[in-house]
Amino acid sequence: MKIVLVFVLGVCFSIQAQQKVNKILDKGDKKLAKLDTTAALSLYDKALVVDSACADAYAKISDVFVSRGNYSNAMELLNAGIRITADIPKDRKTISHLYSIRSFIHFTEENFHHAIQDLDQAIVLNTENPNYFYMRALVKRMNGDEKGCCKDLKKAIALGLKAADVYSQTYCN
């Protein structure tokens, strides 16, 4: 009986903590919509204090850093977020977003091999996002893999990304 009671209490506290994190993230999103990135970052940090494995908070903070051009802080945070959330994949789509942001940073540093590796991982976690296939196609093309580029473009088109069709018509005929 005591074990059941402890289990039920644990589940209740977990649900309450998740609801608290979601409210904090929503407040941060509202601040961000008003372009108050400082307040948004503060709220996203607060969400990580409540739940250090909140992939969504890592993604939101990283997005702000990238938009500010602060790639080194974004990369540090993404590495930590991926390391922490990989073992407890609560939200595969959000974790895949962490990989896609990191791939963008690798791309801007012209580290195409790592960019492709991160996009590969993003696709493993979320096979339904056509943008990941499109991004990987562009990186593959820049890296000289035209066949791989065209294959990824076909997948992006199949998933409904119209921009991939234009690029495919230009480079894959």
Residue ranges and their predicted role:
Residues K2-V6, I15-N173:
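Alpha-helical tetratricopeptide repeat
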